[in-house]
């Protein structure tokens, strides 16, 4: 399929057929989401797996009423359509996005303000973890927390997605001079 060709009406999506382990995730046919004001339609190439997705699958995280029942909070992919007021990313753009659920599907509709262009040095696969994990750590540790060069940080749960990202960002050379 050409990246500029609009998809058919249906898509494959992962549904939680009953609460429990991963064996309760099944591939089903669903309608492609209709675009609302300011939204873009992304052909999903990769989706991150995050703790809320697991909790949702286990029945320990009720889906907000305005969110999709399809798991998946962060994705990377290519813009295939956009609502007329969504002008930030042209069709064909490679982006990553923070979703209000729905990432475990072939297509997801996301507000354009929840999307980021993918840095040229990153693959679609690598970029899928930017919206939820990387941005969460960066905004909380460096922007809000103000962590500076030669300061220490205690990272609880260093083996989680957020914890691993925090460890990597803390020990990496910073693009910012003040870290």
What is each PLM-predicted segment?
Residues 1-11:
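Basic/polar N-terminal segments that are highly enriched at the extreme N-terminus
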Residues 21-25, 51-52:
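Short N-terminal binding/cap micro-motifs at the start of the first secondary-structure element
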Residues 31-48, 60-102:
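Glycine-rich beta-strand-centered segment in the early N-terminal region that forms part
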Residues 55, 94-157:
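NAD(P)H dinucleotide-binding glycine-rich loop of Rossmann-like/cofactor-binding domains
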Residues 160, 164:
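Glycine-rich NAD(P) Rossmann-fold beta1-alpha1 loop
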Residues 170:
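Aromatic pocket-lining residues of Rossmann-like dinucleotide-binding sites
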Residues 173-179:
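Single conserved hydrophobic/aromatic residue that forms the stacking wall/gate
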């Amino acid at each position: 399929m050409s990246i500029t060709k609009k998809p058919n009406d249906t898509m494959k999506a992962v549904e939680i057929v009953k609460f429990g382990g991963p064996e309760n995730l099944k591939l089903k046919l669903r309608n492609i989401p209709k675009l609302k004001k300011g939204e873009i339609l992304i052909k999903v190439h990769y989706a991150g797996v995050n703790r809320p997705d697991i909790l949702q699958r286990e029945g320990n995280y009720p889906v907000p009423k305005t969110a999709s029942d399809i798991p998946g909070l962060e994705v990377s992919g290519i813009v295939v359509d956009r609502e007329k007021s969504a002008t930030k990313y042209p069709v064909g753009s490679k982006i990553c996005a923070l979703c209000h659920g729905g990432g475990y599907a072939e297509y997801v509709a996301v507000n354009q303000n929840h999307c980021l262009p993918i840095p040229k040095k990153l693959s679609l696969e690598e970029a899928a973890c930017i919206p939820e994990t990387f941005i969460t750590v960066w905004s909380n540790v460096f922007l809000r927390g103000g962590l500076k060069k030669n300061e220490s940080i205690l990272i609880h749960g260093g083996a989680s997605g957020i914890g691993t990202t925090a460890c990597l960002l803390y020990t990496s050379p910073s693009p910012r001079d003040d870290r």
